[in-house]
């Protein structure tokens, strides 16, 4: 056992100035000192510089050139420059409205003979005389945002259109309230720019329309060629999405993807349908147990539908998935004794058994069992495989001999296979977190100024990145390459090969290849174009617990057909097997899109914010949120535990078992509290009956005492309503069919914040205490049930008012964790009863800096 130590240094004001990563900590010695310019700092440290106002004006991360930030007098970032921008003398500028909302982002190029320094630019803002570089009309507009109203200059093609034939039950929805023009505080229009490998240009327009609850009911997008994507949504009264239509007008053709959703009384999805134009309809049905756990999915209809069942252990961890085409089992603390597996009580998977079946539901392939071992940091260091539950362990299709440095960079990784091409014994050397050399091939890696891998030593690929740190070109010698186009918000809209006349285009859920419809995604798989896009058929995806596609299947009136089978090494590389059905499906490991070059799979998967290399288990780019995990390499995939964790969007990894465990703890507390409230209710009702039966009391005394008891009943009703609401919200958050992702994140010394990023991921950040988790889970429930919308900074965009949502959260906190966990307020102190949690009390709460929170 070795110590893994991360050092944090603070200035006299208590501000974080240095973070020395575990690998760098080994290089420290008594009396040693390092400057920010030293190689030690550049490779191993996070360094922050503050101005006299306490603002961070420079950030330095390991393996990256510094980032500079310039502020205005209102402490808002006005200009930012990273290493790649500095090479081109560029600055990213931000422009705001009177309420502090960003109205535009621009890219300004300093073409002067003497380049402006950060200090010079800051001095201009400090004197309220904005520098010409910031105000220059020659700067390139990346994004423009409009709020509260619809601009008169907005293209007419973005006008709202009522969709009257959407196939959903509109019971309870008043048609005249579907579109509401009260858009104060909401984004209404934005103009984006297309970013290619060689240019920034091509306008992309987007308009948003809302109902009276501030829910988006239509989004209209128009690209630089005049193609229009109109996404229309319908909700029920409590915010469940009932129907959604994506209508794409392109080249004189209108394609329509219709999706509908049904729910039970607890807002759990019970059915989803999807249909492209007038083609085959996809149908997926869901069933749940009494605990709210998903226990069944049915793909398709009729006699040949695929029925998938799920089972869980007593902790609520998934233990089994079984269908007619694929079956798997997970063991955590009860491994088979003859495999030599360890028992893990932390949620780590010890053994993973699986087997494919033929279309008749009969086993027609070997069953496989992976046995996993982890180090003390839950990093995978060994995997073994056995066939057909034999006690003989094979070296085929395994990754083992995995070792790490103290920053969790992979030092060694051995892979064995039936295919000689897949057999590898990797040995890597590093400078800080950057992989410098593959010792086995004596090949070197190269990086750009932002720490992105520029040359992949193993494949020979060269990768170039845009200002968003997203790949714009992946190429190798011989004019073989992939060229990407993104919008300025990071949305991928095109990819093409070097000599392709027609790119693959992405429009919402729709994908077009060579100008014809290729596929559309839905909750249970993809609808795939046939006959050059003239027709379509439904492909259902059977996945494992990581969301990786294991079987692609069709359901027809005459039978089932398995089109594709996939198995994976632990870090996500596909097995090379003969005799297995294959298809051209690109959405494989973790459900992410694999990149293809002239029909050949490139071991890079698009995780949205970053690309992942499953060959060696690292990301090509640094984690954009690396400041939340100083102790782990910004290139590491899921903290090097790919068996138990998933990466949602390339920005952070999620541990579903940890999330499920937190949710289970809260649910257990809710159930215990509800049972206690029922007992209290019975006792109060008994007392009321006794009061009524007491002949010695006057009628006036009876009414007086009964009124007091009924006040207690009213408080119990509030508690029951709040707890039931929270329970239903947690069920909604954890539903596999929920299109949005909810996750808990523990950050020490955090006051708690629930936010939703631009990809729809809601993070309930908390300080690790039970009361704080209950509080933030309540906000998560409000979002999941459609009563609250927040942005990536946690600011409300619509729904419940601040007092209403906070009263509910603090009431749940008090009931489940105790009134002593409530904060002290200048207006009422610390309440001891539910009625003390009021709007004035909330407004008197201060944070640790003495500032009012609300």
Segments (PLM) and residue ranges:
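A short glycine-rich beta-turn/N-cap micro-motif
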Residues: 1, 10-19, 44, 49-58, ...
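A motif-centric feature for acidic-aromatic and gly/ser/thr-rich catalytic loops and repeats
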Residues: 12, 16-18, 24, 28-30, ...
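Hydrophobic or amphipathic alpha-helical targeting/insertion segments
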Residues: 77, 86-122
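Active-site recognition of the HExxH zinc-binding catalytic motif
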Residues: 548, 771-785, 809
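Short turn/helix-capping motifs enriched in Asx and small/polar residues
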Residues: 557-577, 608-610, 614-664, 668-684
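Cationic, glycine-rich low-complexity segments
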Residues: 652-765
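Short pre-active-site segment immediately N-terminal to the catalytic Zn-binding motif
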Residues: 759-773, 799
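Active-site or metal-binding loop neighborhoods of secreted/extracellular toxin and effector enzymes
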Residues: 792-854
């Amino acid at each position: 056992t070795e110590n893994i130590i991360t050092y944090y240094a603070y200035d006299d004001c208590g501000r974080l100035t240095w973070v020395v990563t575990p690998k760098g900590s080994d290089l420290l010695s008594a009396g040693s000192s390092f400057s920010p310019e030293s190689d030690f700092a550049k490779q191993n440290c996070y360094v922050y510089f503050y101005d006299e106002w306490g603002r961070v004006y420079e950030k330095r991360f390991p393996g990256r050139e510094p980032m500079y930030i310039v502020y205005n007098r209102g402490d808002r970032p006005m200009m930012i420059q990273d290493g790649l921008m500095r090479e081109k003398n560029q600055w990213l500028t931000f422009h705001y409205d009177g309420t502090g909302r960003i109205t535009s982002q621009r890219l300004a190029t300093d073409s002067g003979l003497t380049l402006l320094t950060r200090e010079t630019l800051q001095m201009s803002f400090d004197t309220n005389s904005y520098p010409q570089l910031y105000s220059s009309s020659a700067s390139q507009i990346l994004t423009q945002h409009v709020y509260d109203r619809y601009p008169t200059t907005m293209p007419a093609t973005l006008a709202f259109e009522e969709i009257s034939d959407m196939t959903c039950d509109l019971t309870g929805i008043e048609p005249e309230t579907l579109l509401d023009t009260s858009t104060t505080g909401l984004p209404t229009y934005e103009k984006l720019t297309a970013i290619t490998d060689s240019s920034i240009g091509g306008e992309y327009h987007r308009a948003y329309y809302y109902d009276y609850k501030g829910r988006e009911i239509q989004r209209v997008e128009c690209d630089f060629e005049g193609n229009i994507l109109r996404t229309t949504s319908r909700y029920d009264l409590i915010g469940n999405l009932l129907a959604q239509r994506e209508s794409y007008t392109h080249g004189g053709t209108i394609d329509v993807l219709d999706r509908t959703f049904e729910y039970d009384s607890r807002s759990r999805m019970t059915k989803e349908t999807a249909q492209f134009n007038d083609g085959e309809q996809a149908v997926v049905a869901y069933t749940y147990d009494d605990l709210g756990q998903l226990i069944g999915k049915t793909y398709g209809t009729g006699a040949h539908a695929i029925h998938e069942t799920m089972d869980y252990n007593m902790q609520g961890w998934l233990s089994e998935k079984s269908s007619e085409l694929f079956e798997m089992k997970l063991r955590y603390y009860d491994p088979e004794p003859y495999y030599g597996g360890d028992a893990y009580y932390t949620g780590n998977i010890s053994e993973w058994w699986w087997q494919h079946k033929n279309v008749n539901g009969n086993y027609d392939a070997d069953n496989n069992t992976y046995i996993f071992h982890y180090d003390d940091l839950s990093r995978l260091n060994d995997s073994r495989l056995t066939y057909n539950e034999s006690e003989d362990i094979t070296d085929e299709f395994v990754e083992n001999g995995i070792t790490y440095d103290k920053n969790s960079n992979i030092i060694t990784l051995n892979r064995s296979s039936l295919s000689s091409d897949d057999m590898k014994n990797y040995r890597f050397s590093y400078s800080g977190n950057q992989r410098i050399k593959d010792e086995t091939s004596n090949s070197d890696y190269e990086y750009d100024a932002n720490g992105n891998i520029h040359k992949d030593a193993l494949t020979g690929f060269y990768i170039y990145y845009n200002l968003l740190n997203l790949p714009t070109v992946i190429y190798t010698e011989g004019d073989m390459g992939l060229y990407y186009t993104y919008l300025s918000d990071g949305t991928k809209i095109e990819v093409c090969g070097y000599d392709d006349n027609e790119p693959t285009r992405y429009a919402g859920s729709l994908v077009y290849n060579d100008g014809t419809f290729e596929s559309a995604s839905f909750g249970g798989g993809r609808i795939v174009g046939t006959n050059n896009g003239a027709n379509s058929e439904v492909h259902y995806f059977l996945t494992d617990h990581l969301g990786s596609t294991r079987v692609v299947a069709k359901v027809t009136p005459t039978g089932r057909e398995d089109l594709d089978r996939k198995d994976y090494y632990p870090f996500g590389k596909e097995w090379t097997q003969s005799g297995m059905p294959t298809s051209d499906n690109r959405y494989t490991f973790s459900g992410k899109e694999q990149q293809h070059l002239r029909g050949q799979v490139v071991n890079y998967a698009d995780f949205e914010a970053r690309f992942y290399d499953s060959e060696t288990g690292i990301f090509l780019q640094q984690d954009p949120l690396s400041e939340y995990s100083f102790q782990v390499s910004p290139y590491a995939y899921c903290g090097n535990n790919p068996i138990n964790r998933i990466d949602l969007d390339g920005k952070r990894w999620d541990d579903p078992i940890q999330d499920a465990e937190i949710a289970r703890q809260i649910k257990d507390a809710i159930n215990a509290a509800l049972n206690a409230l029922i007992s209290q209710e019975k006792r109060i009702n008994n007392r009321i009956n006794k009061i009524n039966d007491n002949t010695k009391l006057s009628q006036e005394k009876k009414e007086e005492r009964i009124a007091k008891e009924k006040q207690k009943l009213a408080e119990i009703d509030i508690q029951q309503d709040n707890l039931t609401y929270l329970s239903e919200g947690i069920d909604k958050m954890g539903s596999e069919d929920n299109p949005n992702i909810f996750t808990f994140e523990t950050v020490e010394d955090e006051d708690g914040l629930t936010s939703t990023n631009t990809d729809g991921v809601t993070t309930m950040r908390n300080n690790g205490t039970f009361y704080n988790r209950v509080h933030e889970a309540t906000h998560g429930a409000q979002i999941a049930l459609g009563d609250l919308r927040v942005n990536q900074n946690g600011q409300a965009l619509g729904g419940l008012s601040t007092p209403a949502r906070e009263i509910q959260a603090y009431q749940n906190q008090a009931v489940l964790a105790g009134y002593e966990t409530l904060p002290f307020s200048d207006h009422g102190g610390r309440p001891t009863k539910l009625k003390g949690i009021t709007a004035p009390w909330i407004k008197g709460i201060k944070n640790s800096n003495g500032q009012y929170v609300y």
